């Protein structure tokens, strides 16, 4: 670990100009996301979700983007989890995408709400059966005695629901993040990175360039 001071990458892949950024951050996000997929980034829909509880304590974890619906970012999880409890207390969240092959990062700040139950159920029905059973098995973020306890419960539920449609747990569903700030970062040589930020004022997006 003593050589960390000498670890660095020189970013030379691309540039981000005002002309290429345009004035619609959601269109730019969709473009960058498509390019990340084409580049073969590992799980380009993986994003860090940052939450803060009422005591001001932050938490961050990786979740998967499952849709950009009605100009909002959707993900699914257990409502009783640590993140779910934080969100109940504080609806302000942040998302971060990092695509190292593209030398790009996107930061999103906004407010989060639960999506309608019928939309969560529609998504739950198309999940792989093992994932459905996993959601039914796990009381996310609760303490378990051992891995074996989880596997035994999974196997029991697998037999119980064999040949039947697995119901969505009441504690499981989707969230939707309405963005009010989106920042695009493109790595550049000499650490003079490009940073373009969009901030929502009423129904309009205001674009600015930030110093790196």
Swiss-Prot record:
<feature type="binding site">
    <location>
        <position position="123"/>
    </location>
    <ligand>
        <name>substrate</name>
    </ligand>
</feature>
<dbReference type="Pfam" id="PF10590">
    <property type="entry name" value="PNP_phzG_C"/>
</dbReference>
<feature type="binding site">
    <location>
        <begin position="140"/>
        <end position="141"/>
    </location>
    <ligand>
        <name>FMN</name>
    </ligand>
</feature>
<feature type="binding site">
    <location>
        <position position="66"/>
    </location>
    <ligand>
        <name>substrate</name>
    </ligand>
</feature>
<keyword id="KW-0560">Oxidoreductase</keyword>
<comment type="similarity">
    <text>Belongs to the pyridoxamine 5'-phosphate oxidase family.</text>
</comment>
<dbReference type="GO" id="GO:0008615">
    <property type="term" value="P:pyridoxine biosynthetic process"/>
</dbReference>
<dbReference type="GO" id="GO:0004733">
    <property type="term" value="F:pyridoxamine phosphate oxidase activity"/>
</dbReference>
<comment type="function">
    <text>Catalyzes the oxidation of either pyridoxine 5'-phosphate (PNP) or pyridoxamine 5'-phosphate (PMP) into pyridoxal 5'-phosphate (PLP).</text>
</comment>
<dbReference type="InterPro" id="IPR000659">
    <property type="entry name" value="Pyridox_Oxase"/>
</dbReference>
<comment type="pathway">
    <text>Cofactor metabolism; pyridoxal 5'-phosphate salvage; pyridoxal 5'-phosphate from pyridoxamine 5'-phosphate: step 1/1.</text>
</comment>
<feature type="binding site">
    <location>
        <position position="105"/>
    </location>
    <ligand>
        <name>FMN</name>
    </ligand>
</feature>
<protein>
    <recommendedName>
        <fullName>Pyridoxine/pyridoxamine 5'-phosphate oxidase</fullName>
        <ecNumber>1.4.3.5</ecNumber>
    </recommendedName>
</protein>
<dbReference type="InterPro" id="IPR019576">
    <property type="entry name" value="Pyridoxamine_oxidase_dimer_C"/>
</dbReference>
<feature type="binding site">
    <location>
        <position position="195"/>
    </location>
    <ligand>
        <name>FMN</name>
    </ligand>
</feature>
<feature type="binding site">
    <location>
        <position position="83"/>
    </location>
    <ligand>
        <name>FMN</name>
    </ligand>
</feature>
<feature type="binding site">
    <location>
        <position position="127"/>
    </location>
    <ligand>
        <name>substrate</name>
    </ligand>
</feature>
<dbReference type="GO" id="GO:0010181">
    <property type="term" value="F:FMN binding"/>
</dbReference>
<feature type="binding site">
    <location>
        <begin position="61"/>
        <end position="66"/>
    </location>
    <ligand>
        <name>FMN</name>
    </ligand>
</feature>
<keyword id="KW-0285">Flavoprotein</keyword>
<dbReference type="InterPro" id="IPR012349">
    <property type="entry name" value="Split_barrel_FMN-bd"/>
</dbReference>
<feature type="binding site">
    <location>
        <position position="185"/>
    </location>
    <ligand>
        <name>FMN</name>
    </ligand>
</feature>
<comment type="subunit">
    <text>Homodimer.</text>
</comment>
<dbReference type="InterPro" id="IPR011576">
    <property type="entry name" value="Pyridox_Oxase_N"/>
</dbReference>
<keyword id="KW-0288">FMN</keyword>
<dbReference type="Pfam" id="PF01243">
    <property type="entry name" value="PNPOx_N"/>
</dbReference>
<feature type="binding site">
    <location>
        <begin position="191"/>
        <end position="193"/>
    </location>
    <ligand>
        <name>substrate</name>
    </ligand>
</feature>
<feature type="binding site">
    <location>
        <position position="131"/>
    </location>
    <ligand>
        <name>substrate</name>
    </ligand>
</feature>
<feature type="binding site">
    <location>
        <begin position="76"/>
        <end position="77"/>
    </location>
    <ligand>
        <name>FMN</name>
    </ligand>
</feature>
<comment type="pathway">
    <text>Cofactor metabolism; pyridoxal 5'-phosphate salvage; pyridoxal 5'-phosphate from pyridoxine 5'-phosphate: step 1/1.</text>
</comment>
<dbReference type="InterPro" id="IPR019740">
    <property type="entry name" value="Pyridox_Oxase_CS"/>
</dbReference>
<feature type="binding site">
    <location>
        <begin position="8"/>
        <end position="11"/>
    </location>
    <ligand>
        <name>substrate</name>
    </ligand>
</feature>
<keyword id="KW-0664">Pyridoxine biosynthesis</keyword>
